[in-house]
Amino acid sequence: MKWLVLLGLVAFSECIVKIPLRRLKTMRNVVSGKNMLNNFLKEHAYSLSQISFRGSNLTTHPLRNIKDLVYMGNITIGTPPQEFQVVFDTASSDLWVPSDFCTSPACSTHVRFRHLQSSTFRLTNKTFRITYGSGRMKGVVVHDTVRIGNLVSTDQPFGLSIEEYGFEGRIYDGVLGLNYPNISFSGAIPIFDKLKNQRAISEPVFAFYLSKDEREGSVVMFGGVDHRYYEGELNWVPLIQAGDWSVHMDRISIERKIIACSDGCKALVDTGTSDIVGPRRLVNNIHRLIGAIPRGSEHYVPCSEVNTLPSIVFTINGINYPVPGRAYILKDDRGRCYTTFQENRVSSSTETWYLGDVFLRLYFSVFDRGNDRIGLARAV
């Protein structure tokens, strides 16, 4: 019996492809010294989700944690393959990287796709535009072979940027969207849907484990769930509607007192967001309740008080998900402790929260396209 269990584990591990993530120096500290943090956060921390213009074959892909700002992983495009660092983003649907014919300064500081060097490249005459918080890009839809670990999507449509503005401080080369196809700004079929249609994955599921480790441990996995990354049972939450990774949140509380989302609200589970983002008035109230003092674009607390701060509890589908002070307070390179609650600068008619990497480092997340639901469990 022991041999059967051992053989099963060996077979299971052979189907897993892990793509590591590592944590680098925080861009928050680098940029804040140049009074550029507000624009940088608008462009990169949570605006990826705010587009204004249109089991058996388990694959795990390692990601790198850029000092609590963003998690990146490597993919390759073309034949022979060219490597790019991309953000795996559950709030957008498209894959795009810089093109070799982009002359914008932002493109010159990143890896650009050299289409003439790929024998499988195919151009289309379709263009697209996308606008972020304070940046914008223009691109063209093309086709080529894209690889995520050992997953291969042939003739995959994706975007090549031909103009980029406001992205000069970006660490990553591009974005790989994992949301539903209906919110694609380019109209191209997302890579996850293409892999599913090509039967490259056994189940229409992907999952994220975001490690606290600066150098390794974080993974995105496709086609199933590796149960070694979480403890207990997965708590499944139905989506508000098929077509977006957003769920109904019951409330947000501190010490059993409701402080936000009092009548229920919308929560987007967003791997492309570094912080927890919500309406300005409610975020300011949280800062007041924990005694955070504004300084520039940040709110700070004495580092000596971090372990005494109350947990902020997010209740989703009747299950409490506490986020302790040591998770929502981070330390910058000057040794100062700042909060990771940020106000949403884009107005919304309904109360909406973005549960970004601060939340997802605590809770393993599963995105189930087959059943239009999200699973959450305590990460190991």
UniProtKB/Swiss-Prot annotation:
Q: Which residues form the propeptide?
A: 16-53
Q: What class of enzyme is it?
A: hydrolase
Taxonomy, superkingdom: Eukaryota
Q: Which tissues does it occur in?
A: Trophoblast and placental tissue. Produced specifically in the invasive binucleate cells of the placenta. Becomes detectable in maternal serum soon after implantation.
Entry-linked InterPro entries? Aspartic_peptidase_A1, Aspartic_peptidase_AS, Aspartic_peptidase_N, PEPTIDASE_A1, Peptidase_aspartic_dom_sf
Q: Name one GO biological process term.
A: proteolysis
What pairs make up the disulfide bonds? 102-107, 261-265, 303-337
- Which cellular compartments is it found in? Secreted, Extracellular space
User: What residues form the catalytic site here?
Assistant: 89, 270
Signal peptide positions (record): 1-15
User: What molecular function terms (GO) are annotated for this protein?
Assistant: aspartic-type endopeptidase activity
**Glycan-bearing residues:** 57, 74, 125, 182
Keyword annotations: Aspartyl protease, Disulfide bond, Glycoprotein, Hydrolase, Protease, Secreted, Signal, Zymogen
* Homology family: Belongs to the peptidase A1 family.
Q: What does this protein do?
A: Appears to be proteolytically inactive.
Q: Which PANTHER family match?
A: BETA-SITE APP-CLEAVING ENZYME, ISOFORM A-RELATED, PEPSIN A-5
- From the Swiss-Prot or TrEMBL record, give the protein name: Pregnancy-associated glycoprotein 1
